């Protein structure tokens, strides 16, 4: 993961849409405290099974990203690799609004989404521009793309 090599990640990490959980497990192996969430109960069960024999700093939770206000405390880093561009338009606002509950003023949000400039590839998927606009509407001040 290049973000590690670039020194962009900080202690407490949320991996949103964590299946297949390799990022969460990798970051935990490096000493980061990681919470991996996915809306899929099956994905979380598989992640827990994979890590049950490992001693690591990762916890997996089956959770809808729009309900992150249920978490206590804040995350220093949020990683969204392919989660946002696969949700419905009607879920954009709750998805991004939840970030304001879990991020503090120095938190970083990293997003990998389909580019809106290549419409033949993303079709119905949502791109980074929509994510950026939704974050601004929800007062998330810092955004790393």
Curated annotation (Swiss-Prot):
GO terms for biological process: methylation. It comes from the Eukaryota. The keyword Cell division does not apply. Keywords: Methyltransferase, Transferase. It holds the Pfam family Methyltransf_25. It is an enzyme of class 2 (transferase). Probable methyltransferase. This is Uncharacterized methyltransferase C977.03.
